Structures are given as C-alpha cells and as structure tokens.
C-alpha cells in the first residue's frame, strides 16, 4: 500500500449511508459564522455521485423560492455532520442533469417501492 493510500484510508468516514442519484437527502452541514458554529440542513435530490475514495463527491439540487440551487459536497468532508436519507428515488440514470430543465411536477422523481 502506498503512503498516500494509507493517509486516504485514515481520513475516510465510516458513517456515510448508502445513497445514490434520485435519492432525496438531508445534508447537515456545519456552518462557521465568526466564532459561532451551527448546523444548517440542505435538503434536495442527489443528481450525481462521482469519484472514489477520499475524493468522492455528490451534488444535491433543490428549488428555493423558484430558483434552482445546486451544492456539491465531498462525501468524507469533516464539515458534514451527517446525512439523512428521506426517500429513495427510482431513476434509470447515474447523472440526473435533465432535472435542471424541468419545473414543478415534471421535476418530481418516482419513489422506489
């Protein structure tokens, strides 16, 4: 095992749930404002998950006051407190970029049974 692999292995989180594109998740993010730290929840649909190991990232999309907001998080980031899975989505794609063009009910994803 290389030295970098050993460092990467020690930095991986073990509390990451199994989730994928189409799942609706609550990402609890640590936000530091001045000397205070608080937890902010970002709820949305996972539109992609890419990379592997310590470099793995996922992108969450939500509609906020009619404006689409996307945020990309590293899976193993220390700034993420925890991730809750709200619903499992039934999708046939690994990257859901087509959701960017859809609004309202058309942007809704069927729930996995």
From Swiss-Prot:
Keywords: Ribonucleoprotein, Ribosomal protein. Disulfide bonds: none annotated. GO terms for cellular component: cytosolic large ribosomal subunit. It holds the Pfam family Ribosomal_L19. The keyword Ribonucleoprotein applies. Gene3D superfamilies: 2.30.30.790. One of its GO terms (molecular function) is structural constituent of ribosome. PROSITE patterns: RIBOSOMAL_L19 (PS01015). InterPro entries: Ribosomal_bL19, Ribosomal_bL19_CS, Ribosomal_bL19_sf, Translation_prot_SH3-like_sf. GO terms for biological process: translation. Belongs to the bacterial ribosomal protein bL19 family. HAMAP family: Ribosomal_bL19 (MF_00402). This protein is located at the 30S-50S ribosomal subunit interface and may play a role in the structure and function of the aminoacyl-tRNA binding site. This is Large ribosomal subunit protein bL19. It comes from Mycolicibacterium gilvum (strain PYR-GCK) (Mycobacterium gilvum (strain PYR-GCK)).
């Amino acid at each position: 095992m290389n030295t970098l692999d050993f460092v990467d292995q020690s930095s991986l989180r073990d509390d990451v749930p199994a989730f994928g594109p189409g799942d609706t998740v609550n990402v609890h993010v640590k936000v530091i404002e001045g000397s205070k730290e608080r937890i902010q929840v970002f709820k949305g649909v996972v539109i992609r998950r890419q990379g592997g190991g310590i470099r793995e990232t996922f992108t969450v999309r939500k509609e906020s006051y009619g404006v689409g907001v996307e945020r990309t998080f590293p899976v193993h980031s220390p700034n993420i407190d925890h991730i809750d899975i709200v619903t499992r989505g039934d999708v046939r794609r690994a990257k859901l970029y087509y959701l960017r063009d859809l609004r309202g009910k058309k942007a809704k994803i069927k729930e996995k049974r």
